[in-house]
Amino acid sequence: MKTLLLALMAMIALGTSARTSSDELTAKADNNGYIVFEGDIAPDFTVTLTDGKRVTLSSLRGKVVMLQFTASWCGVCRKEMPFIESEIWKKHKDNPEFMLIGIDRDEPIEQVQKFRKITGVTYPLGLDPGANIYAKYALRNSGITRNVLIGRDGKIIMRTRLYNTKEFKKLVERIDEELGEKTKNNH
């Protein structure tokens, strides 16, 4: 009986702890569901790309990194991805100081490969089973598309949510600035 009572108390304590942690994340989140902010060190993770290669974020220190959280069912993602491809990836893909990874939220590799074909993007796409990488950056139940720009020092320097042309232009300009390149409008 004593063992049963102790086990029950332990389960209640764990449940309360998990709920408190979830409540704390919700309280910390901004109105876009982000739980990370400009100036924060970007949470580390390892992602498996569709080609089987594994990439750990911390191994990219010293580079400017853009994370694009996406999914095949996201209409806004489908709208934004061709612009990411043409205005960011094609411009910087050969720059060794830059990395872009699309992180597909909780879909199997076959779906992600089909999604790549439909959108026509060539930048790396990674798999996020269970949305566990996503949950390091935003509330698990919050929506996508969202982009996180990370500086060479590993700190977040910009976050976007949904596809807004003015905000996207600022993202492009910020990447160019971080890489020491001029935007097309500044030539």
What residue spans do the PLM features occupy?
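Short loop/turn microsegments at loop-to-beta-strand junctions
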Residues: 42-43, 65, 144-146
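A short beta-strand-turn-helix
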Residues: 36, 45-65, 137
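Thiol/disulfide oxidoreductase modules built on the thioredoxin-like
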Residues: 117-122, 128-176
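Hydrophobic beta-strand anchors of alpha/beta hydrolase catalytic cores
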Residues: 66-67, 100
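Structural microenvironment flanking redox-active thiols in thiol-disulfide oxidoreductases
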Residues: 78-119, 130-136
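Conserved redox-active cysteine motifs that mediate thiol-disulfide chemistry
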Residues: 61, 69-83
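N-terminal targeting signals for export/organelle localization
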Residues: 1-44, 186-187
